[in-house]
Structure formats: structure tokens, C-alpha cells
Amino acid sequence: MRVTQLSSQSFIFPSPELALREPNGLLALGGDLTAPRLLAAYQRGIFPWFNPGEMILWWSPDPRAVLFPEDLHISRSMRRFIRHCPYRFTLNHAFADVISACATERDEGTWIGRDVQQAYCQLHALGHAHSLEVWLENELVGGLYGVAVGAVFCGESMFSRADNASKSALMVFCHHFTQHGGELIDCQVLNAHTASLGAVEIPRNFFLQQLSQLQFSPLPAECWLPQSLNFSSAMQ
């Protein structure tokens, strides 16, 4: 089966069912990272992932890794940490700083090149991409970012520069997300870190069914307004 070459004149993607089995989920190549194309991709359960300087690759793996926010796993050690959590949390206060940190904190290299950062910052400016920041005093020590598609949040990356910063970020985000009607977090591909936090694999078809329904359930505007978030309320 051949991988589809995307047209520069159209934002139409092939069906995810046509994705390769090996490498798992590779569906298409080419195109660009303009906001309309990125949104068209996420609405169809497709995401970009490629090495900087190389052709853009588009993926929809099977199975798909997801996190149901209510199933977030909090370990005993994390519960002990929570009692004296030194951090404060904000939403959409420093998106560009978060995505830049996600790019630089990867020892094994990153796909988040300058063009990717610019593309997602544009999505953020349009109100589709969002970040959660973790602060120790006035220093950014952790965070995550992703793209909202109705009641689904497509998580892209997270980073941590202090103990449990990224785990705390996800805990606070899950609480805020569900409080405003969010139902599903797309983790794309399962790894040891996301699995330890409660992410599971589900069949791609089931994920696409959920996405097709939940993307038409937009969360209230106040969910994504820049704001400070209360860590203690997330633990109740």
C-alpha cells in the first residue's frame, strides 16, 4: 500500500483506515503546517510527526493511546508530594515558552522544530491550541500543550524541570478539563510515562468514533481563558 502525497491545493486527508501497519499509522506525507490543514487533520484523528528538515509525515496509529481523565493514576509517592506541593499553575499564560521548553528538554532529539513551534503558536493565537504552565516562584518548571477538538484534547508534549512538575501539570489539567465538560485526552502513542499515568490503548476505529461525536461538543469559552488554576481543588 502506498502512502498518499498530499496536495498543496487541498486540505483533504485519506481515510485513517488506509494507514500503514508498518510503520504503524503512517498515512500521508507532504502538505504544510497551516492552521486549516492542522485543524482538518486533528478533526480526523491525524497528527504530524517528522524530523526537522525532512518532509512532513502524517499519522493515525492503531491502536490509539488515550487517557480518560477520570482514570488518571496518582501514585502513593505523588499523593505524598501533593500535600506540600510548591508549585502554582496557570492556563494559556506562556504557550510559546511551553512549546519551546518541550523542544529543548528532549535528550534524544525532538520533532518540535522552529516551523512546528510557529505553526502551533498560530493555532494558539486562533484559540485552538492551549498550554498549562507550572511555576516555582517565577520560574517555568513544567507544562504541557495540545490542541482542543471539542471535548477532546489532543495532547502533544509535556516537559519537567523539577520534581513531579509534568505529573502535577497533567493532574491539574485533567481536573480543569473535566470540570468544563472535557471527556477524552488523546495521547497518540503509548509509552511508559503515559501508561504510568493511566493512559490505555484502544482500537483506532473506537477512537475515531469517539472523536467524531465529541468534536461537536465544544467546551465553554471560559475553559480556555488565561487564568490561574487551583491545585488543591484538583485533589478533592
From Swiss-Prot:
Its main location: cytoplasm. The keyword DNA repair does not apply. It catalyses: N-terminal L-lysyl-[protein] + L-leucyl-tRNA(Leu) = N-terminal L-leucyl-L-lysyl-[protein] + tRNA(Leu) + H(+); N-terminal L-arginyl-[protein] + L-leucyl-tRNA(Leu) = N-terminal L-leucyl-L-arginyl-[protein] + tRNA(Leu) + H(+); L-phenylalanyl-tRNA(Phe) + an N-terminal L-alpha-aminoacyl-[protein] = an N-terminal L-phenylalanyl-L-alpha-aminoacyl-[protein] + tRNA(Phe). GO terms for molecular function: leucyl-tRNA--protein transferase activity. It is an enzyme of class 2 (transferase). Pfam families: Leu_Phe_trans (PF03588). Belongs to the L/F-transferase family. This is Leucyl/phenylalanyl-tRNA--protein transferase. It comes from Yersinia pestis.
